[in-house]
Amino acid sequence: MERKNFAERRFLPVVSALLFFCLAFLPLSVSAQEEPEIDLLAALVSSASYSDDGGLLVRSWLKETAWDFQSRSTSTRAAEGRVHLARKTLADGRRIAVLSFPGTENKKDIEVDLRLSAVPFGGTSPAEFTAVAAGSDAADLPHVHKGFNDFVMAALFTEEMPEFGNRTAGEALADELKEHPEEVLYLTGHSLGAAASLVTAARLADLGVPPEQLHVITFGAPAVGDEKFARLYETKLHFTRIVMKADPVAAVLQSLGKGFVQFGEKIVWKPRTREDRFHHEMALYFDEALRYYCDAVQTDSPHELFCGTPQELAGGLYVAAPSLDLPEALAQDAPYIERAVHDALDVRYAPTVFSTQGGTQESLFAAARAAGCKYVLVEHFSGNLLRERHGSFRLTLEEEIYTSDGRLLSLESRSTNTGDLPAIEAFLYLMYKGSETRDAALGL
């Protein structure tokens, strides 16, 4: 998809530019039990970094759940650097920020990917970064992929802005972190975006940001630099790289004999979907992150990272146990679909009561009245294998909304294919597409 909306505007308005790197957020301490939440958050923000329909959908969802999502784009002759910042204040006053970069989206990004030569990496200011990379007598310095370095320099370390005191955005970010040593910055991305997040963290480290403030989580990251780069920066930042089993891109640069090596904590995921999907796509990483989260976090309500302020109904919503009619290949997805649907409704509406049992319509309406609910939502999820597309499915969501005395308010059916999104996320997409109709039926 063409990114004209980003290319045509070099920056957001001045006020947004000022806010972009005014982080002022407290560190989010992460226990071992919270790692699935952080991985899912990183996957969400990485997905939102893309400008396709899926990315725009995730951005809308993040904003609905009280995330502030801002974007900026800076074009140079070498690259079109794009960066996004997601921020949220938690209930206890802590705030979290995630800096993300998109993967390959346009022709200029492809040129960046194919710029395979290695350039020297060093310096303690943007001017020095540029000078060192342009130098030739630097055998003792670390070296990095030229295209990835071009992308990061364009995004954060090229243009000095009056709004940042004639500093680059990257310098403003580094200074903000150094002034507030209690702060933590998460950096994330997929593919090209993964490489950019690591190079950015290394640049911030060279600007004096200490390791405890830099946490990098990547998906399908190619190698970025040589052995010297790996050994130097493995102690200057926290780096977790999540790799899908059989993802060909994660190892492609090592196979080219350019001296690029991987480092950091490696976590290998094996895709559990039975759909026929390319193992490098961000949608598959997001799908696995969601599954790991559902497996690890067994609660009645979503984690506070994924909650916002629900819309208050004039009378509660009684949600019938979902009806699922899925082909055998998607049967294993049923618990995840049910959990995702539950959380999506719980986040959007209040009060809600969820039924766990089936029954007749009469018993359903009676249960809703007994629970003090004015509305009843009935959802049916179904899918069929597409013969013309191996491993792909046609999914349908049917929604009925009634009053608790049995009066039908809304009946709607929506369908999509599992082309761009796996089944779980595709059903969530259908739910989101029906939000306006559902809201209207519920009197919102």
Residue ranges of predicted features:
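Surface-exposed short loop/turn segments
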Residues: 360-415
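Serine-dependent carboxylesterase/thioesterase catalytic core
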Residues: 171-253
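C-terminal/domain-edge helix-coil "capping" segments
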Residues: 310-315, 386-390, 400-444
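N-terminal secretory signal peptides that target proteins for export/translocation
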Residues: 1-9
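A conserved cap/lid and substrate-binding interface adjacent to the catalytic center
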Residues: 70-188, 206-213, 236
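A structural "domain/chain start" motif
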Residues: 305-349, 439-444
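Lipolytic serine-hydrolase domain surface
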Residues: 226-311
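Bacterial N-terminal signal peptides
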Residues: 15-27
